[in-house]
């Protein structure tokens, strides 16, 4: 595509580049949330010793808000303070997009305010799951061995081939800083 674009003077089609970047982001999210059981690494949603909250029906009443408060109470009980982040599966994120009676606010807005702005949706959690973390470096971090790089592999059949490479590992230092809703 690069060669053809150069020859005819047209802009390069970056669709494949965008798709590759998206695939890398999805794999990184999967590593962070599910870990790599084959290699013996835990993810946030699979960590042994993480605090588990039996999730109520988030499509009803203020159940989601109440469940998140339970998670934050756990952090308070364990004296964990700092930045909080809540990651939810796409189906749960959709359930949070409804007005709460007598507040005039979406439940997602209330929860986002409760956790200090850190509300994220990720397909890496699958369905009907959420993870709340106290995202401070003393609790967890992402160890980067090799940051994301792109290497030129050569050309074949008028296409230029590249390899995208990264090594990273989630390091959970304090499992009390992870709350799994499921």
Where are these regions (language model features)?
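Residues forming anionic-ligand binding surfaces in small-molecule and nucleic-acid pockets
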Residues: 1
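Long, histidine/aromatic-enriched segments associated with O2/redox biology
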Residues: 18-24, 52, 83, 108-113, ...
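Residue-level signal for secondary-structure boundary sites
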Residues: 28, 94, 170-172
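Short, catalytically relevant binding-site loops at active-site mouths
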Residues: 37-41, 90-95, 126
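Sequence/fold signature of self-assembling virion shell proteins
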Residues: 99-182
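Alpha-helical scaffold segments that mediate packing/assembly in large oligomeric complexes
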Residues: 4-70, 74
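Extended, solvent-exposed, turn-rich assembly/linker loops in the middle of proteins
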Residues: 45-110
